[in-house]
């Protein structure tokens, strides 16, 4: 079989494991490796897991593979950032997670597969080449190193960005060049945490609920309770960084092939939470809820919602989206208030 052989390798793995607490470093690395694997899902076949690296293959050889790897790189650093934001643990593993990095090795060649004790192994001279390339002379920690063979189907616009980095091994000389991924990393880490400013929000509102901020926050974030007040058949919860809410997703299933995904961008329990979702006409919608006690048995929630509409139809889009969001919001707010008024009964229903 011929195609691209791809190695995704976490940089700084050995130092991270050696210098940090074993339990937390193991959990963090498992989360990162799982994130890389999920990003590759359905696009690159993961043939081998090699500690801090994944050996992958694909019959695709075009520039689309590079686009996939850039996307995976962004998701990797987005997860690192979420872990750093979410954790309050002072251990070295949690405090130095931003020192980890990711690099890719890409080579085009022939390979075959065989099994040992039920585990797939890759075989072939080109498999040896891509593994040798993990040890190279590239003067960076994060990059995409591609052989000349891998680049043959890529456009000149991309090849022109690569810097030559020929390598020599026992398997012979390998013509290769690398792409610096540091600008992508910097863009992720420097991207401001989106919170909706009430002054620029397209929808602003205040609702008062019976109960404490902790109770209200729980009703907003507990998937089983969200299922009840949204009135949908199912809400699947995907945990965020280190099991937190930051980066978490709520997959709200409305019916066959109908799903709305709410992603938590920022959270400071029980006082504030920012989510984003895809909404008809508007595209991405952002919502920030600011939660504050108002007396011993009442909680005030100030909500700010924003989206971006462009073009000549923007006023009409704004009108339609605002109308729909206010309609849904009124229904949901009423249900949450009713549920909070009889919390024991609703908690029992949610646990069924």
Task: Give the residues covered by each predicted segment.
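Catalytic beta-strand-to-alpha-helix segment of the class III nucleotidyl cyclase homology domain
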Residues: 61-168
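Glycine-rich portal/gate segments that line the openings of hydrophobic small-molecule binding cavities
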Residues: 208, 227-228, 237-286, 300, ...
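Catalytic NTP-binding/metal-coordinating core of nucleotidyl cyclase/transferase enzymes
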Residues: 1-71
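Hydrophobic ligand-binding cavity/cleft-lining segments
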Residues: 192-241, 352
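Residue-level recognition of strand-loop junctions within catalytic nucleotide-signaling folds
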Residues: 58-60, 255, 306
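A conserved amphipathic terminal alpha-helix motif
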Residues: 306-352
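Beta-strand elements of well-folded, non-transmembrane domains
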Residues: 12, 37, 110, 211, ...
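Intrinsically disordered, glycine/charged-rich C-terminal tails and inter-domain linkers
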Residues: 139-215
């Amino acid at each position: 079989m011929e195609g691209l052989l791809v190695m995704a390798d976490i940089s700084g793995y050995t130092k991270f494991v050696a210098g940090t607490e074993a339990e937390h470093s193991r959990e963090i690395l498992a989360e990162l490796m799982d994130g890389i694997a999920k990003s590759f899902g359905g696009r690159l076949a993961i043939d081998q897991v090699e500690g801090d690296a994944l050996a992958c293959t694909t019959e695709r050889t075009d520039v689309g593979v590079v686009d996939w790897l850039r996307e995976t790189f962004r998701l990797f650093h987005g997860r690192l950032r979420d872990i750093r934001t979410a954790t309050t643990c002072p251990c070295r593993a949690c405090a130095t997670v931003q020192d980890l990095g990711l690099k890719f090795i890409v080579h085009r060649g022939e390979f075959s597969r065989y099994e040992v004790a039920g585990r797939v192994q890759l075989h072939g001279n080109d498999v040896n080449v891509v593994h040798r390339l993990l040890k190279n002379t590239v003067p960076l920690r994060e990059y995409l190193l591609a052989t000349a063979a891998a680049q043959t189907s890529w456009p000149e616009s991309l090849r022109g960005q690569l810097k030559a980095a020929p390598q020599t091994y026992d398997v012979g000389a390998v013509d290769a060049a690398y792409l610096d991924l540091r600008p992508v990393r910097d863009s992720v880490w420097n991207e401001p945490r989106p919170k909706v400013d009430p002054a620029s929000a397209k929808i602003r509102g205040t609702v008062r609920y019976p109960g404490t901020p902790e109770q209200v926050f729980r009703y907003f974030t507990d998937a089983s309770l969200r299922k009840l007040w949204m009135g949908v058949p199912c809400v699947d919860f995907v945990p965020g960084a280190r099991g937190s809410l930051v980066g978490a997703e709520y997959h709200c299933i409305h019916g066959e092939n109908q799903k709305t995904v709410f992603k938590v961008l920022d959270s400071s329990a029980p006082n504030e939470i920012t989510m984003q979702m895809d909404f008809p006409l508007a595209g991405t919608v952002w919502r920030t809820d600011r939660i504050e006690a108002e007396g011993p048995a009442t909680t005030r929630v100030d909500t700010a919602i924003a989206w971006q509409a462009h073009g000549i139809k923007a006023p009409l889009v704004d009108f339609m989206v605002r109308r729909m969001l206010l309609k849904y919001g009124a229904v949901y707010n009423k249900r949450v208030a009713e549920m909070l008024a009889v919390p024991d009964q609703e908690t029992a229903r949610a646990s069924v």
